[in-house]
Amino acid sequence: MATVLLIGASRGIGLEMARQYRQDGWRVIGTARDDAGLARLRALDCEALRVDVADPASNSGLAWQLDGEKLDVAIYVAGVIDRADTTTPPTRETFDQLMHTNVMGAAMALPQTAPMLQEAGGVFAVISSVMGSLAQTQSGGSALYRISKAALNMWMRCAQFDHPKLCCVAFHPGWVQTDMGGAQAPLTPVQSAADLRQTLERVRAHRAQYQGAFLNHDGSPLPW
């Protein structure tokens, strides 16, 4: 049975991916930071681990909680947004929240899970955003969010060189009807999760082709 680790899977795209993977017979290990999130994962018959990705002390214990595991896929799904532009200075609290959740959490998770993934020739993926693409930036809105996703993309690009036995991939999930995306978004979590899973299967089948890639949810390449 294949095993997937979903980091930050208590709601939205992460929870839907957990549901779909379990439905297809995968073993799913999901993380959440609170009791409600853990309960939602367990209700889907997933193994649930308590990890607060924004807390380095909590995040540093991920490898210990996963001791002895072999993973086929690990996906960092956690993310938060701030919609302010650059006309006002960001607060330290907002800056730290975005950078800790969107960047540091993934940066701490990757080296902890890499040995578990390498044994299976696995994939480490992050849910990034096209808003982190320098080439496609057309406005200054959500500036800190954009910066955090650009930093996450660079971390993944660097990680591919440092972990050549892995396939490290960054994904744009689309504009999705989640708490972050809003009800007006064109994609449902079901559609986005299904697309991401289908694309991940192509990535697993052709790892060398996709190492260090930045992809749309449908598998099309995105400019950095």
Segments (PLM) and residue ranges:
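Catalytic loop of short-chain dehydrogenase/reductase
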Residues: 80, 84-99, 107-108, 120-161
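Conserved glycine-rich Rossmann-like NAD(P)H-binding loop of the short-chain dehydrogenase/reductase
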Residues: 24-39
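N-terminal Rossmann NAD(P)H-binding glycine-rich loop of SDR-like oxidoreductase domains
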Residues: 10, 14-20
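Conserved N-terminal Rossmann-fold NAD(P)-binding element of oxidoreductases
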Residues: 4-8
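Rossmann-fold cofactor-recognition segment
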Residues: 43-57
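Conserved Rossmann-fold cofactor-binding substructure of NAD(P)-dependent oxidoreductases
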Residues: 53-69
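C-terminal helical subdomain
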Residues: 170-173, 182-224
